[in-house]
């Protein structure tokens, strides 16, 4: 604590519909890639903490899965429960919306956050894409009318526009507390978890329109030998056809997935990485609560 500034620390939930820019926002605030991103909805499946300590202020961000209407599989129910649970026991809630469109799933999130009793901030994303800034004003006014107790901040998560103002507003609302984490800690997640997420991100980016959503990644080995990290990752799918898609013609696609994931791992872990990937069919895992628990999806 400095003479004029109290030490502040608290939890900040980042919520919104799928693919609205929540993970991109977290990565930009942290100044490094922690949460995986892609253009595909439901890229984020787990709540994850991203911790930023700056001077007397420690903000502990909770990146959440996008709230969505699909509830037909156990995996969908898990993600929706995770996102809703993040609204409880946090000090600040950031509701991320996309300036360019409003969907039924945005409305679903709005109906959840209207019951938030603590500080609520609406982060209006992608405002850098507007040719006429005057067009933004009616949209901001409409949001303010929907959530009159919220503060509205236009941002660009991708470009970093106005994030300093957003962070200053968050810091103002954090309670006076000693810091909960060491200054150099940036997440609560293990290296094994982060490695699995990087592989899954590369799969989602490589597959495009062919993407089978019933994919998960399990790290079977994570071992340091000298200056080299040896990582063995198992990619689980539900059907033989999905396995063929991931492997690709003569194994070319899985080679690209492995190469791209390895490069990001070497940056994240600051070490040389030897990465081996396997693909295995496990039918129905995404709707099997026991299988989901064994794969690290927690309480269902």
Curated annotation (Swiss-Prot):
Give residue ranges for domain KH type-2.
199-283
Record-annotated Era-type G domain positions: 8-176
Q: Which Pfam families match?
A: KH_2 (PF07650), MMR_HSR1 (PF01926)
The segment annotated G5 runs over 155-157
Q: Which residues bind GTP?
A: 16-23, 63-67, 125-128
GO CC list: cytosol; plasma membrane
- InterPro entries per the UniProt record, alphabetical: G_ERA_dom, GTP-bd, GTPase_Era-like, KH_dom-like_a/b, KH_dom_type_2, KH_sf_prok-type, P-loop_NTPase, Small_GTP-bd
Q: Where is this region: G3?
A: 63-66
Query: What are the record keywords, sorted?
Result: Cell inner membrane, Cell membrane, Cytoplasm, GTP-binding, Membrane, Nucleotide-binding, Ribosome biogenesis, RNA-binding, rRNA-binding
Biological process according to GO: ribosomal small subunit assembly
Q: Where is this region: G1?
A: 16-23
- From the UniProt entry, list the residue stretches annotated as the region G2: 42-46
Q: How does it sit in the membrane?
A: Peripheral membrane protein
Compartments, as annotated in UniProt: Cytoplasm; Cell inner membrane
State any single GO MF term.
Answer: small ribosomal subunit rRNA binding
Q: Where is this region: G4?
A: 125-128
Share what the entry says about its subunit structure, partners included.
Monomer.
- Recorded family membership: Belongs to the TRAFAC class TrmE-Era-EngA-EngB-Septin-like GTPase superfamily. Era GTPase family.
The protein's role, per its UniProt record: An essential GTPase that binds both GDP and GTP, with rapid nucleotide exchange. Plays a role in 16S rRNA processing and 30S ribosomal subunit biogenesis and possibly also in cell cycle regulation and energy metabolism.
Entry protein name: GTPase Era
- Gene name on record? era
């Amino acid at each position: 604590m400095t003479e004029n500034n109290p030490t502040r620390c608290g939890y900040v939930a980042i919520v919104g519909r799928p693919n609205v820019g929540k993970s991109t926002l977290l990565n930009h605030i942290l100044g490094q890639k922690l949460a995986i991103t892609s253009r595909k909805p439901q890229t984020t499946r787990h709540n994850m903490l991203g911790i930023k300590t700056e001077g007397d202020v420690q903000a502990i961000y909770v990146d959440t899965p996008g709230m969505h209407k699909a509830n037909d599989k156990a995996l969908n129910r898990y993600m929706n429960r995770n996102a809703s649970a993040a609204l409880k026991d946090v000090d600040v809630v950031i509701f991320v919306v996309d300036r360019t469109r409003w969907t039924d799933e945005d409305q679903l999130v709005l109906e959840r956050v209207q019951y938030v009793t603590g500080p609520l901030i609406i982060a209006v994303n992608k405002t850098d894409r507007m040719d006429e800034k005057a067009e933004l004003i009616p949209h901001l006014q409409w949001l303010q009318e929907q959530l009159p107790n919220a503060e509205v901040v236009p941002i660009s998560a991708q470009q970093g526009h106005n994030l300093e103002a957003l962070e200053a507003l968050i810091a103002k609302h954090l309670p006076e507390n000693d810091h909960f984490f060491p200054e150099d800690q940036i997440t609560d997640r293990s290296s094994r978890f982060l490695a699995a997420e990087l592989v899954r991100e590369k799969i989602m980016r490589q597959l495009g329109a062919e993407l089978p959503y019933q994919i998960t990644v399990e790290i079977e080995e994570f071992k340091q030998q000298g200056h080299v990290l040896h990582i063995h990752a198992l990619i689980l799918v539900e059907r033989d056809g999905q396995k063929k898609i991931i492997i690709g013609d003569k194994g070319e696609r899985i080679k690209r997935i492995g190469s791209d994931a390895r490069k990001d791992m070497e940056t994240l872990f600051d070490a040389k990485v030897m990465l081996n990937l396997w693909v295995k069919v496990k039918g129905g895992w995404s709707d099997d609560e026991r299988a989901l628990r064994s794969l690290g999806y927690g309480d269902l």
